[in-house]
Amino acid sequence: FHFDCFWMKEFHWSDFVWDERVFPDPEGMLKRIKAKGLNICVWINSYIGQESVLFAEGVEKGYFVKRTNGDVWQWDMWQPGMALVDFTNPDACKWFQSKLEVLLDMGVDCFKTDFGERIPTEDIMYFDGSDPKKMHNYYTYLYNKCVYELLERKRGKGEAVLFARSATAGGQKFPVHWGGDCWSDYELSLIHISEPTR
């Protein structure tokens, strides 16, 4: 059973906190769903909005991608002032995993790792000094790897699964992937079927 983005409050993506207005008892709800034999997936992404309780913590600890002047890189695409977790920083990855681990302990089984493909390439720097242009594709690998390693640690080898929207070479190590957000017509369906084999 999949919960898409609005399991969290609007403008709080991603804080990994259930919206109590809609889900006043998330643990009880998850237990009821699991009692019916269903596994649970929740939507996440690697952007942390200014309204998220995690934003200040991530800024203070240096867990976000930065501009070359040292400021946190921010973007206003879906919500104001989103920062991007820097998965080249091992501590940032552990921090991100620690937030997801709370959800796994609550009863969530997997994560839909959305986005990861709209990565800046100009005027930014990564913790490990990676080339921003090369990171444009590699970022999604690191994002999915970070989440998958947590799932494997918590659920066991052969039991971990994520639901990834974007991937690059090597992404097949972190199953499964979906080719979503496309039109449902014959021509695009053919492209959609052939693209993964390239």
Tell what function each PLM region has.
Residues F1-S194, R198:
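Catalytic-domain carbohydrate-binding cleft regions of carbohydrate-active enzymes
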